[in-house]
Amino acid sequence: VYAEAQHGVLTRFDRRSGENIDIQPQPGAGELPLRWNWDSPLVLSPHSPTRLYFAANRLFRSDDRGDSWQAVSPDLTRQLDRNQLKVMGRIQRPEAVAKNASTSIYGNIVALAESPLAAGLLYVGTDDGLIQVSEDGGTHWRRGESFPGVPDLTYVSRLVASRHDAGIVYAAFDNHKMGDFKPYVLRSSDRGRSWISIAGDLPERGT
């Protein structure tokens, strides 16, 4: 059993032995600290019972249930300074609001999926509006940053790879923090190269 707490704390519990160990990936010597979301995405691969994917601002893979980890991506975010982004229409002083105190660290991966039909076909979504795709288990990445009808920098709230067609993936975006409650639901039929909106007649304030 795997359990997660805030900011990337990850544990594995063996129900037979009672063993409970911390398996959170750590940065290597000389590397920058990792940026974990409040609820960092964890995926158990549908292609191997021992393979896990876990994401901070980089994506990690384990092939031994978390005993060891390998980084399979660079930083997949825009690497923006949150203090240079507008809040309520203008750039605020760092101490003006609690954006650096009781909130998630900005610039991390918040959505993650592996195709159940194609091992190593990975989809990553970030809190700063990117969808990154790898078709080879993380060796190469293809960046998507513009999506029809979706405002720039919108939080990628969910990614779902189709169980019926390896080329199809669905994405949902959430922009309520900017006072925008529109539903943003998209589909790609070419592994994230292009997207169309499938929000249809969902309620205007349906987030």
What residue ranges belong to the model's regions?
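Beta-propeller blade termini and top-face loops
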Residues: 1-207
